[in-house]
Design a protein with these regions (language model features):
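Rossmann-fold dehydrogenase core element
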Residues: 101-119, 139-141
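C-terminal helix-rich "cap/oligomerization" subdomain common to oxidoreductases
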Residues: 62-64, 292-337
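Active-site loop of classical SDR/Rossmann-like NAD(P)-dependent oxidoreductases
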Residues: 6, 32, 278-291
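Predominantly a Rossmann-like dinucleotide-binding segment in NAD(P)-dependent oxidoreductases
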Residues: 119-209, 329
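Contiguous beta-strand/loop segments that form the cofactor/metal-binding neighborhood of enzyme cores
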Residues: 184-258, 289-302, 320-321
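Beta-loop-alpha module in the N-terminal Rossmann-like domain of NAD(P)-dependent dehydrogenases
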Residues: 33, 45-105
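N-terminal Rossmann-like dinucleotide-binding module
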Residues: 1-42
């Protein structure tokens, strides 16, 4: 459902490579995007301008949603009525109220609800998570997450994607949502729910006529830890990494690998953040979003973190609290679940 999110083209490629996946229909109202999709999918795939008509006529078992964040609830409501499993690109929704309602509807309809993050399938992500949970660092005391790039327009996103990415209602914000969600995802997964949220944001590209931030910092407070989230559309290059510290050492995960540095170890000139860790193979069912979504549906397995609905309701609650903190200039207490 939707072709106006540029991640859709990678997902169509993943569907084509997945033996268990059959693409039956696509819904999007933009003729230019439909023409592009027709060049990339089998001829028997049906196209609709109205996604509700598609749900009724094509009767899919599951949908992949790739459109504006503020439409996620509306589309899930229609899927829940028809008991159709639902996966969407991050974040789960543009507001916490929408996210909570999506989880409620999915649970009531007994359908799978998944939120796709690209980092969830990386070998470096799996390795860092398992080492942290195995206690290799001791109790997590600090998490530093940095996700960003030069900016949507600067990296050449489509005009259809840009139309809603730069809209504070359709997206829910700017960089604070687009990349801040990764930091909230990591923090909730590795440390749990914070007690308070403080944030500030900037509009560095003042010449661009849009109403969203392009640089943000979010500070999450825990009784025994802090998490610092840096999200930006202003960096000179693309970057996505998380660094975790505990009394026994630190781990740094990038898209390319994991570095480990033990407590009291001497810094290595070639590897100041630690020594490279050998990454094990990722099982096929957790190697990409299509394979995992189908695996959970076919085997009636629950969607697990970090792509599960419950954690991602928390992600959007953190983002809402961050935006409220920016508005008031004060830290926002986050109620316990």
């Amino acid at each position: 459902v939707g072709l106006d999110h540029d991640h859709v083209w990678g997902l169509l490629g993943a569907i084509a490579k997945e033996p268990e996946a059959e693409l039956v229909a696509i819904a999007d109202p933009h003729p230019e995007l439909v023409d592009k999709a027709k060049q990339q999918v089998p001829a028997e795939v049906k196209f609709y301008s109205d996604y509700v008509k598609m749900l009724d006529e094509a009767k899919p078992e599951a949908v992949i949603v790739t459109t504006a964040n503020n439409r996620h609830l509306e589309i899930l409501r229609e899927c829940a009525k028809r008991h159709i499993h639902y996966s969407t690109e991050k974040p789960l929704a543009s507001t916490a109220a929408d996210a909570r309602e999506m989880e409620r509807l999915a649970n009531a309809a007994h359908i799978k609800l998944m939120v796709n993050y690209w980092n969830a399938w990386a070998a470096s992500t799996h390795e860092l998570f398992h080492r942290v949970y195995a206690g290799e660092l001791g109790p997590v005391q600090k998490i530093i997450v940095q996700y960003g790039h030069e900016g949507p327009k600067e990296i050449g996103v489509s005009k259809y994607f840009a139309d809603w990415l730069y809209d504070p209602v359709k997206n829910g914000g700017g960089a604070i949502v687009d990349f801040g969600c990764y930091g909230a995802e990591w923090a909730l997964w590795l440390k749990g729910r914070p007690s308070s949220v403080f944030a500030y944001s900037l509009k560095l590209k003042t010449a661009q006529a849009n109403a969203v931030d392009d640089d943000a910092v979010i500070l999450l407070e825990y009784p025994d830890a802090t998490a610092i989230i840096q999200a930006s559309w202003d960096w000179p290059y693309s970057k996505g990494q998380v660094q975790v510290f505990g009394p026994k050492g630190s781990l740094l995960a990038t898209g390319d690998g994991v570095l480990y540095r033990a407590a009291k170890s001497q810094a290595d000139v070639d590897h100041p953040d630690g020594q490279p860790v050998t990454l094990g193979p990722v099982p096929h069912e957790t190697s990409n979003p299509i394979a995992y979504f189908l695996y959970c549906i076919r085997n009636d397995k629950p969607i697990e973190n970090p792509v599960a609905a419950s954690l991602n309701v928390g992600v959007v609650e953190i983002l809402d609290a961050a935006k409220e903190s920016i508005r008031t200039g004060r830290a926002v207490k986050l109620p316990a679940n």
